[in-house]
């Protein structure tokens, strides 16, 4: 039971109990555990000593006296946004973005080569916490347009089998297709898979043999599992401004792809390498 598990956690060697579901209830369980001898006085003192030692090492007692334990937001932003840190972010993006596989002669992209672009934006819904950065698709679309590309956002049409728009409406209109996938795992969602739009998987990449297609994942590096036939695939691993700017530089040939796969983006599947 939780009543026993709470004190047994400390007795087993954990010094601090975090992420309590109900602090009053868990406090009472802890107190009863001490009274019942589940947590011995020796173990209690050991845990408290370690906790206080950590706080002392962090000088929290001094910061509490000065009122600086929680920094003022303005001061924090001054530290977080200094040029040295921004330079680190740019360097990290430049060195990490990975061209996982490439169809010959698709890259680099330029407005002269691909004037009209069809843009597919696949992203998670906003939630409470641990969620993806919202609006990445809008940001990247504007970046493409700023370079001179004409970009249309894909919107699924209403219809059903036999009544959808003709294939040639896309293949005869667009010079390039770009998928930007912004899906991210979080604490209680350990698997992320692409869920295709209705009707009938309207945004599935089916024009790859007719229109050059580039797929970009800005978070999860394993999406080839769901789109193995995509011939040009890029992982950026993050969606901040520095990553998006570096991505565009590399797509347009102004910077080389330097990243080396830190994981297996092919997911041990033979068809993802085709």
Question: Where do the PLM segments sit?
Answer:
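Preference for extracellular/luminal or secreted protein segments
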Residues: 2-274
């Amino acid at each position: 039971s939780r009543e026993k598990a709470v004190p047994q956690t400390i007795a087993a060697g954990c010094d601090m109990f975090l992420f309590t579901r109900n602090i009053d209830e868990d406090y009472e369980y802890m107190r009863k555990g001490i009274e019942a001898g589940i947590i011995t006085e020796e173990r209690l003192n050991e845990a408290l000593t370690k906790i206080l030692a950590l706080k002392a090492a962090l000088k929290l007692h001094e910061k509490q006296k000065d009122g600086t334990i929680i920094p003022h937001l303005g001061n924090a932003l001054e530290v977080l946004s200094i040029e040295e840190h921004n330079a680190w972010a740019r360097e990290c993006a430049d060195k990490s973005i990975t061209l996982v596989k490439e169809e010959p002669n698709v890259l680099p992209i330029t407005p002269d080569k691909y004037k009209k672009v069809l843009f597919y934006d696949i992203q998670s819904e906003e939630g409470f916490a641990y969620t993806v950065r919202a609006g990445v698709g809008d940001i990247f679309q504007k970046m493409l347009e700023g370079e001179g590309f004409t970009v249309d956002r894909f919107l699924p049409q209403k219809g059903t089998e036999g009544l959808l728009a003709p294939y040639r409406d896309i293949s005869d209109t667009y010079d390039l297709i770009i998928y930007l996938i912004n899906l991210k795992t979080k604490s209680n969602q350990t698997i992320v898979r692409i869920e295709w739009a209705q009707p009938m998987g309207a945004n599935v990449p089916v024009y790859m043999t007719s229109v050059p297609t580039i797929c970009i994942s800005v978070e999860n590096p394993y999406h080839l599992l769901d789109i193995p036939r995509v011939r040009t695939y890029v992982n950026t691993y993050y969606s901040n401004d520095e990553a998006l700017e570096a991505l565009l530089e590399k797509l347009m040939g102004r910077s080389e792809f330097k990243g080396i796969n830190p994981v297996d983006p092919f997911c041990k599947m033979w068809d993802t390498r085709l």
